[in-house]
Amino acid sequence: MPIRLSRGSILVRFPSSDGLSLEGRLTKAAADRAVVLCHPHPLYGGSMLTPVIMTAEQAFQEAGYTTLAFNFRGVGGSEGAHGEGKAEVADVAGALGYLEATLGDRPTLFAVAGYSFGSYVGAMTAAADERIGFYLGVAPPLNH
């Protein structure tokens, strides 16, 4: 399936914190805040093209956020294999590092937003990463 881009979006590649090459969709904003969007379970068809992720991405863009939606390891053009939710924390850390490097000193607020499996990975990352100012989980799993 071709990747749909919103106006101003570009396709990017960046490394996970453990060295895998991941694909993403970046839309820059003038404001000093940025969000990483994490998709639902890869083994059940989740990707950065999931409608809930694309809707959240649009809402954050309308609120003035730079957005980075990406495919976890093993999804689409991202390298690697599914890591049961634990290895994917390295993917989110890599996305945050990419935003830091790309945007420089501009962002003062980094956020992570996830849907289902992505909310689980986002929560684990937010609990361990001081760069994250807030976390948004949509339909988080309750028994993981």
Q: Positions of the model-derived regions?
A:
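Serine-hydrolase catalytic machinery in alpha/beta-hydrolase-like enzymes
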Residues: 15, 20-105
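Homeobox/homeodomain signature
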Residues: 2-4, 12, 38, 107, ...
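An N-terminal hydrophobic leader/cap segment in hydrolases
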Residues: 1-15, 20-27, 110-112, 117
